[in-house]
Amino acid sequence: MKHLLASLLVPCVILALLIAACSEDDPTGPNDLGGETNLELTQVGQEFPISISVPGTQSILSELKDSIVITANDGGIVTMRGIVGFDSAWVRGLEAELGISALPIPSKRAILETYMQRFGAVIDSTDKQAMTMRVDAKLKVTSEGMQEFVSSGGDLSRPFTIVKYDMNVGDSWEFTDADGVKITRTVVSKSTTDDYEVGFWYLKVIKVEETREDPLMEKITYVTNHKFGLVGVHMLTKTGKEIKTIVFPPTL
């Protein structure tokens, strides 16, 4: 059980991030989001394969068995379900890779519960050779940007912006999540050429960096494309490791 508690942290973070995106009440503010909502990208049934790696290493994260599927779309409010599968051997390997093996059980449990509550994850560990974790989350995706409801605890009246495609480098905004934690997001780069690799393709992207108080992560960078939405998430851990997730849009 202690290995399970420690090792589910990263998958929980990854899934919740992959099914995120944002907006606000002020019509001129960074969290206001308009645009077309009837997009091929977000039709029910669309599936988003992912690839996870830690550059410079043969990370056990690359073995993660995943499935992320759109299960509902109500006027641009999209429900995505992420499911990851793993076994006890993978769990032990991830614990060692994260360098958290020495933490006492109560500390591991507290960290895990923080993420589980934040992202509403459900774990089935009945069969230690075929464990699963499921995350269901709602987001808003339009032709103008993306919004997420994870930070508001699922409150659809409080979306928070990950990106608006007309933003520029240096644009920055802050908000407080459902737990009272201040989150800052800043546009750190905007491509003028196709320079971000997604499989066999190169895309123009906007990178938005997020900082917040977090037990494991120093910062998170969301990588988005104006046509394909979220195509990458880069997480920098407090121990200096970069966890790089590439998202393969079904319409690419």
What does each model-found stretch correspond to?
Residues 1-10:
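Bacterial N-terminal signal peptides that target proteins for export
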Residues 18-21:
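C-terminal motif of bacterial Sec signal peptides marking the signal peptidase cleavage site
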Residues 23-252:
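Conserved functional acidic sites
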